[in-house]
Each structure stands twice: as C-alpha cells, then as structure tokens.
C-alpha cells in the first residue's frame, strides 16, 4: 500500500498481489465509516485500517488487514518581537517547526525573519512530500515621538534670557 502523502488527505492506496489458490478470486474490503469495496486494488483512501477477504474459486478464504497511515500535521509555533522604536528594523519572527515528513523548508517570500521593520510578513512551510502550511505575522512599532509646544513666553527685552517654552511629548 501507499500511505497518505499529507495530513488530512485521502490519497492512500492498496495494491494487492494475489497468488496461489484457484483463479477467479473475489475481494471484499471493509473499513472505518462504512467503507466497502470489491475491487482488488483500492484508491483514494484516508488514514485507517482496511480489512480484506479474498475468496478463490474453491471457496478458500484468506483475510487480513492493511493500515494506511498519514504524516503528522505540520505545526509552526511563532515567537515574534515587535520593533522597539518607531522607524526601526529590529523586529523578529522565529518559527519552531514540527510535523510533516522529512525536512521542513521555511520561505518568508524573500524576507529574512530577523531585522524586520513594521508590517505583515507571510511564511510558507514545505515538507519532503510537498505538503504546505502557511501563516503570517504582523510586526508593530511604537508611535513616533512628537514634541508639542504648549506655550511660549517671549523674552522681555532684546538679547534677554527670560523667555520660556513649555512642551509635552507623545510616543
């Protein structure tokens, strides 16, 4: 049999090779959720156990079971750090990956998940079976620091030093 390529798919198959007995075999397959088939080879299977019964022309019977498995789900756990100052580029996005089949390849669409400025970044994960998972992260930044002039007191005489400016800031 051929197991499932990606978690949740139904592309498994079982190919029987029947030898021995007396020709004109009949095959019966049963499985989970009422699965039933009378073909020798079965396709588009989901992960499950499939029981077969083969009967030859002399009514001799052979039975057994085949298990079709699937890879674990691709899981990405995201840890992000936002930009520390407005206009900066020190945001980060780090993925901890598990599941799938073989090595998981991370693609951030040309971006490096370090030294990020504010914005939304999308990633795509691909395993050895070409199974795909994707997601995105939004990196934020604090608002810009602004100085607000609350009031101005002019100097009283030319070249004087008794003027005052009162300010407040935001951000």
Which residues fall in each region the model found?
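Proline- and Ser/Thr-rich low-complexity, intrinsically disordered segments
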Residues: 1-171
């Amino acid at each position: 049999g051929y197991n499932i390529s990606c978690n949740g798919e139904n592309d498994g198959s079982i190919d029987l090779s029947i030898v021995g007995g007396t020709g004109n075999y009949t095959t019966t397959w049963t499985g989970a959720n009422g699965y039933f088939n009378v073909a020798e080879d079965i396709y588009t299977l989901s992960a499950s156990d499939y029981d077969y019964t083969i009967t030859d022309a002399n009514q001799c019977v052979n039975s057994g079971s085949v298990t079709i498995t699937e890879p674990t789900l691709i899981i990405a756990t995201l840890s992000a750090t936002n930009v520390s100052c407005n206009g900066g580029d020190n945001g980060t996005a780090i993925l901890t990956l598990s599941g799938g089949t073989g090595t998981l390849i991370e693609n951030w669409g040309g971006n490096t998940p370090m030294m990020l400025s504010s914005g939304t970044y999308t990633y795509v994960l691909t395993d050895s079976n070409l199974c795909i998972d994707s997601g995105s992260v939004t990196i934020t930044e604090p608002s810009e620091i602004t100085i607000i002039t609350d009031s101005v007191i002019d100097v009283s005489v030319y070249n004087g030093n008794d003027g005052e400016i009162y300010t407040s800031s935001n951000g």
